[in-house]
Design a protein with these regions (language model features):
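Active-site cores that bind ATP or allylic diphosphates and position pyrophosphate for catalysis
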Residues: 166
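Compact, Lys/Arg-rich rRNA/RNP-binding cores from ribosome-related proteins
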Residues: 163
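Catalytic alpha-helical scaffold of carbohydrate-active enzymes acting on polysaccharides/glycoconjugates
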Residues: 1-109, 114-155, 171-244
Length: 244
């Protein structure tokens, strides 16, 4: 991948259904297989940030992600927010998840649950072998606008929240609004099934129609010259973090 190209980092957070409001794995069981089929159809590869406990409970599905050529990264051992844990417990959560996931594949990428990563843990990520972190977002403090290097870890911000990606007009609007040389999009398998909950940001525009929306969005970015790559690929031309 050349740093001169325009890249779309496509990622999925493989976690229990809409945590902490629901607690099941319907999304993983029913939504994830369709995501893998869609990516095969599009001939693109993505990053799947997997909760460690989910990997233990659904090991066959995680193995299938790897066998189909996608990257797996860590999403913590449970989906508990790291900024609400004691420092050592937070680090152990990351370390435990990486230990589990390395049974399936190499792990160089990380995304914190709820995009909440205390700054002191960035150095710990590097010590644990992580080289790419995607726990920052354009729309949340500190409003990171572009990738940067911190303690040897390349930090790649998320461009837009997943509930916006679910919008019926996302494939028309997002490629016009976000036309940087990099765009980072994430979704969850539970968003591809019909979710019932009182919070609108959880259930609105969820369901099987999201497959077609995602297909249209990816094709819209490809039409603008974007290459779809896993986040872990970002380390290849910039191992020193000096070229971003």
């Amino acid at each position: 991948m050349s740093t001169q190209g325009r890249v779309l980092f496509l990622s999925f957070d493989v976690e229990p259904d809409a945590p902490p409001y629901l607690n099941g794995l319907r999304g993983v069981d029913q939504g994830l297989p369709g995501i893998l089929d869609l990516l095969d159809e599009l001939r693109v590869k993505a990053t799947f940030f997997v909760v460690g406990k989910v990997a233990l409970e659904r090991s066959a599905l995680i193995r299938e992600i790897v066998d189909r050529g996608h990257e797996i990264g860590s999403h913590g051992y449970t989906h508990e927010r790291l900024d609400r844990l004691p420092p050592q417990e937070a680090r152990e959560s990351i370390a435990s998840s990486i230990e589990v996931l390395r049974r399936f594949s190499r792990v160089v990428s990380f995304r914190a649950p709820n995009l909440a990563l205390p700054p002191f843990l960035v150095r710990s990520l590097y010590e644990l072998g992580v080289r790419v972190d995607s726990s920052l977002a354009l729309y949340k403090p500190p409003f990171a606008r572009r990738p940067f290097c911190q303690h040897g870890v390349l930090r790649v911000p998320v461009t837009v929240t997943s509930s916006v990606v679910r919008s019926p007009i996302s494939s028309r609007v997002l490629p016009l609004m976000f036309r940087h040389w990099f765009v980072t999009i994430f979704l969850h398998p539970w968003e591809f099934i019909r979710i019932r909950h009182w919070r609108p940001d959880i259930w609105v525009w969820t369901g099987s129609g999201l497959y077609l929306k995602l297909k249209s969005l990816v094709k819209a970015y490809q039409a603008q010259g974007y290459y779809v790559v896993p986040l872990g690929r970002a380390t290849k031309p910039v191992m020193s973090c000096g070229n971003w």
